[in-house]
Amino acid sequence: MEYISNTLGNLVEQTAFMNLTLGNLIMIAVACFFLYLAIRHGFEPLLLVPIAFGMLLVNIYPDIMLHAEDSANGTGGLLYYFYVLDEWSILPSLIFLGVGAMTDFGPLIANPKSFLLGAAAQFGIFAAYLGAMAMGFSDKAAAAISIIGGADGPTSIFLAGKLQQTSILGPIAVAAYSYMSLVPIIQPPIMKLLTTEEERKIKMEQLRPVSKLERILFPIIVTIVVCTILPTTAPLVGMLMLGNLFKESGVVRQLTETASNALMYIVVILLGTSVGATTSAEAFLNMDTLKIVALGLIAFAFGTAAGVLFGKLMCWATKGKVNPLIGSAGVSAVPMAARVSQKVGAEADPTNFLLMHAMGPNVAGVIGTAVAAGTFMAIFGVK
């Protein structure tokens, strides 16, 4: 009888119930809410499902993120080894490879002025940097936080790892991916506030056809120009353009399919679960996290507003040939931001098709955010 009692006692002690804190319960509830948003409402399920499940796991069983050096036998937890790939900036670079293989830069090549809209939307990054500095974050932490304004999760993780801001990598990544998934909710009110109905109804001229030679030369030229000026951008811009060259060359179909499908989804699983696993109650439930989330929202709103306002300027300069709504697509949430531009434009005029025009600033924003990250790395002397 005593043996049975001891055995049952040991079993009870091994359950998670004995170690759950109020903070863990709060984070479990947050994880379930994210799963609900992803599954029930379809808010970027490819991102939110693995992130939320990683969040769920680490708050039930913290040792799944146990660092190898803290382990009695020298073996870390499963998700710790996934997370190491985040710290080393391997997974974000592979994400860019997959994104490049999936991206059509044709609208940007056909309308190079889109680069200006993509650049304007990066204003949110530098606004967030100043805001983070004002809130008491160090200069490197402020730089890592500011990339949230570009709505670019992989770049946020990449820069946080490079600047050795791993203590806030979890909140940064969760905020960035959350705002990426909430683009359809956050952007429309800002877009409607800053534009008139007449502006939203503007129809743009059809884009010119882009030749195969232009498509092949584009990733090569961008790599040479950007990586020569800012070599620190090579891991992101280089991988992005390599993936696109796979796609546009037409001679490595197997590599294109692998990079844009199997490899991409494997990396998303590893990245999402490991990022979610950094959100233990002890690491996440603090004032710094609230500041980061608030700064991210402000930065994203500023970036959207800056893009729309620059779009209005281009509309005025071209005498009404540019719909300002495409400026909001300058953030690098691809293709969600472009779809939002299309949706808001169609609400004003159902016959208005802005999607391809918005894709130009959208893909320019991806390059712009990577360049912003490279600029911060150059400023701090990080390679």
List each model region and its residues.
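N-terminal alpha-helical transmembrane segments of multi-pass membrane transport
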Residues: 1-74
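Transmembrane helical segments that form the transport core of multi-pass membrane transport proteins
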Residues: 223-310
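Interfacial helix-loop-helix linkers and transmembrane-helix boundary segments
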Residues: 39-48, 66-67, 81-82, 102-117, ...
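Alpha-helical transmembrane segments
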Residues: 167-185, 295-303, 326-327
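Alpha-helical membrane segments and immediately flanking helix-loop junctions
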Residues: 88, 96-102, 117-127, 131, ...
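Entry/N-cap segments of selected transmembrane alpha helices
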Residues: 32, 108-129, 280-307, 358-362
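Intrinsically disordered, low-complexity non-transmembrane regions of multi-pass membrane transporters
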Residues: 1-19, 25, 71, 75, ...
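Membrane-embedded hairpin module used as a gating/binding unit in multi-pass transport
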Residues: 175-251
